[in-house]
Each structure stands twice: as C-alpha cells, then as structure tokens.
C-alpha cells in the first residue's frame, strides 16, 4: 500500500515537472518570437527609411539635372520668372506677345510718368498660338484693367508656328501645370508632345553645351532668389540697327493665324476680359501690304475690342530708323523710351488708368524704377558706342558684361534675325 502511494506521488511529481518544462519552453519560444518580430519590424522600418532617402535623393538629383539641362533663352527665363515675383492683383496693364513687348516698352518708365503698373510678358519669337496660353497664365495671378497684345505673332507665314524651340521657351518655363498641359494638347503636334511632357528626353544631349546650360541655370538661380522683378520684363540690346534703309516687309494673316486669333478673342470674352487692345508696335521696315492690318482690325473690332497700329505714328512719336532701332524688328533704348512715353499716354488717355495702389506697392515700384534707371542709363551709354551688350533683369544684380553674356549666349536666334551681341557691333551712327 505504501509502495503504491509512493509510486503515485513520484509519478505526479514527474508529470508536474514535465508540464512546467513544457510551459517554460513554450514561453521561451513566444519570447524569442516576440524578440525576432521586434527585430524584423525594426529592420523593415530601416529598409523603408533607406528606400525613402534614396527616392528623395533621386528626385532631387533628377530635378536638378532636368533644370540644369533645360537650355532656353535667358531673357525669356528672366521675363517669365519675374512675372511670378509680382504680388497678386497689382498689375494694371499686361503686355503680351513676342519680343516687341519687352524690347519696345519699359514698365518702370511708364510708372514714373503715368503712375500705372504694367508688366511685359513676352517670349522671343512667340507665335500667335501661344498668346491664349500667355493670357491664361497671366490671369492665374493678375486681374489687369487692360490687356495689350502686340500682334506680330499673328502676322507671319504658317511655318512660324512650326518652330518648336519657340514653343519650348514658353511651355517649359511656366509654373501652372494645368495650363502647361492644356497648351501642349492645344498647339503641339501629337508626334512631338512627348518632348514637351518629358523635357529631359529633349534636353539630355545638352551636356555637350555645358557653358550654355550653366548660363541659363545661373539665370534661373538668380531669379529664384530675386525678391521682385525690377525691370518688369524690359530688355534691350545696346546697338544701332544695320538694316539698310528703305527696306519693306510683307505681312501675312493666314487662315491659321485667323483661327488662333479668333480663339483668343473668344477666350477673352469667355473670361470676361473687358478692355483689350491689339496693337502693332513700330518696326523699322515699312509694311509692303498694309491691308493685312485692316483685316486684323476688322476681326478684332467685330468682338468689341480695340485695334491700333502705331506704324504710321513713328514720325509723330519721334522715332527714326537711323537712331531708334537695334535691328529691323526692335526699338533700341532710345526708341523704347520714346515709344513708352507715347504708349503710356495713349493707355492713360484711352483707358483711364488711375494710380490707386497701396503705399507698399508704390514704394516697391519706386525702388524698382530707381534700380531700373541705372540699367537703362548704362544701356544708353553703351548704345552710343554700339557695344551690343544685352541688358535685362539680371543686369540689375550682376556686372553688365557678365549679365550680357548670360543673355547673348543664345540657344537659337530670337524673333527676327536678332544675333548674339558679339556679332552685333556696328559703327557708331552720327
């Protein structure tokens, strides 16, 4: 009996020890699993961080490379970027068009003499097909009292619309992504749209022209850090035109141009833009077929907007081909100051532009005008010597020779036969 009792006690003791060993083993396994799970979680977390950091570095490098190799004209870059520096809803007059609007008209001079604010949103060689996009971009930030379109972009033959390098100058540099994509769909041929939506595909070979890339990149960096645009888009080349006197130019107003202008007029109406002036600025060559301007005038006025050609007003303005042009298409600093004085009075008289800006805006514009005056004075002195230096926004911040090198290291010829400054030296006109 006692042996059976002892045997049972020993058996139960062994069973209890077995259960305890099993329980401890199970707990140890769970603990090890928990430790392993924590280590795995930390490992996954570190992996995610590494992937995220790599992705961030890749994006930054890709963005830098894309921007560095995006080689478009420096004056266009400065003009477009400068527009975004203007405080919202502070511009009275938007000047839109090709290079005439930034070569022939100075917003700071108009401010000093007439008290209204304006901006020259121009792109060299811009065809009329871009004007709608330019207005669309302007309206994202400004509600101007008057919009002025210089019509030269509509007065060329149809091949003018096929120069994609001019389209890139605008499309690749604007900030509003929706407008950029809409513009590509509207005016770029389908077989070329990929070069606009994926610009690195187009620009990747620009490493061969590293100096030009550096020049345009320097302009982008400079405009990024600029607090405002002192020149308000204005730009000039310090020289006299060497175009032989008596030359004539034939204008075109093709069906394609008419269609683009009609679309622009419809857009102005749809957006409720009430005061619009389509204008022809003075050019050196006489017009061979002035009836073309009558056709433009008829179309514009059929929509209730204004048209004015100032080609016939050159003598009244005081502009002469000997002293006031830097090439056959653009006024030099002498001519632009004369035309700005005339245009400022014309706009003030016809559109009743009141100087009703805040003290802060008036102070800012006064400072911009002061700084622009220095650049304009330097340009006038260089023009007397026909040195050919290019003055634009970056001339406010950099030595004139260096800033000129940024502008004159062209990617392509500008609007109408404009050449790099080193090719522009001509004898001083007496």
Whereabouts are the PLM-identified features?
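N-terminal Lys/Arg-rich, disordered targeting/topogenic segments
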Residues: 2-47
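Hydrophobic membrane-insertion alpha-helices, especially the h-region
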Residues: 49-67
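Alpha-helical transmembrane signal-anchor/signal-peptide segments
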Residues: 69-89
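Catalytic nucleophile-elbow at a beta strand-turn-alpha helix junction centered on a G-D-S/GDSL motif
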Residues: 91-105, 330-333
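Membrane-embedded segments
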Residues: 100-183
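Conserved, well-ordered alpha-helix/loop/beta-strand core segments that scaffold catalytic motifs
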Residues: 146-158, 220-316
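Secreted/periplasmic serine-hydrolase-like ester/acetyl group-modifying domain
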Residues: 164-273, 357-410, 420
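C-terminal regions of proteins
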Residues: 288-371, 375-400
């Amino acid at each position: 009996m006692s042996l059976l009792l002892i045997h049972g006690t020993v058996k139960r003791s062994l069973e209890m020890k077995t259960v305890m060993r099993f329980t401890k083993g199970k707990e140890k396994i769970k603990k090890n699993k928990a430790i392993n799970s924590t280590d795995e979680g930390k490992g996954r977390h570190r992996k995610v961080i590494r992937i995220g950091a790599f992705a961030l570095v890749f994006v930054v490098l890709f963005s830098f490379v894309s921007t560095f190799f995006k080689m478009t004209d420096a004056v266009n870059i400065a003009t477009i970027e400068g527009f975004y520096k203007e405080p919202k809803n502070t511009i009275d007059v938007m000047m839109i068009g090709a290079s005439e609007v930034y070569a022939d008209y100075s917003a700071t001079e108009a401010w000093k003499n007439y008290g209204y604010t304006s901006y020259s949103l121009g792109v060299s060689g811009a065809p009329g097909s871009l004007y709608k996009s330019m207005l669309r971009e302007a309206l994202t930030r400004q509600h101007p009292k008057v919009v002025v379109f210089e019509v030269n972009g509509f007065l060329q033959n149809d091949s003018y619309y096929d120069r994609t390098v001019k389209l890139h100058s605008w499309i690749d540099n604007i900030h509003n992504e929706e407008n950029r994509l809409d513009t590509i769909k509207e005016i770029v041929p389908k077989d070329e749209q990929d070069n606009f939506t994926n610009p690195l595909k187009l620009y990747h070979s620009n490493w061969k022209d590293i100096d030009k890339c550096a020049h345009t990149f320097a302009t982008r960096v400079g405009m990024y850090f600029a607090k405002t645009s002192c020149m308000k888009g204005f730009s000039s080349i310090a020289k006299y035109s060497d175009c032989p006197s008596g030359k004539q130019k034939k204008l075109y107003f093709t069906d394609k141009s008419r269609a683009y202008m009609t679309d622009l007029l419809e857009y102005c109406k749809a957006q409720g833009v009430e005061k619009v002036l389509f204008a022809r600025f003075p050019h050196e060559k006489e017009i061979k077929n002035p009836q073309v301007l009558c056709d433009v005038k008829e179309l514009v006025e059929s929509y209730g907007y204004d048209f004015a050609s100032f080609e016939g007003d050159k003598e009244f303005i005081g502009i002469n081909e000997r002293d006031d042009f830097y090439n056959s298409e653009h006024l030099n600093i002498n001519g632009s100051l004369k035309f700005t004085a005339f245009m400022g009075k014309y706009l003030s008289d016809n559109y009743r532009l009141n100087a009703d800006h805040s003290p802060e805006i008036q102070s800012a514009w006064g400072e911009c005008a002061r700084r622009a005056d220095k650049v304009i004075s330097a340009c006038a002195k260089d023009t007397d010597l026909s040195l050919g230096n290019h003055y634009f926004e970056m001339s406010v911040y950099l030595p004139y020779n260096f800033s000129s090198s940024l502008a004159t290291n062209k990617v392509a010829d500008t609007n109408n036969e404009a050449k790099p400054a080193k090719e522009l030296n001509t004898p001083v006109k007496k």
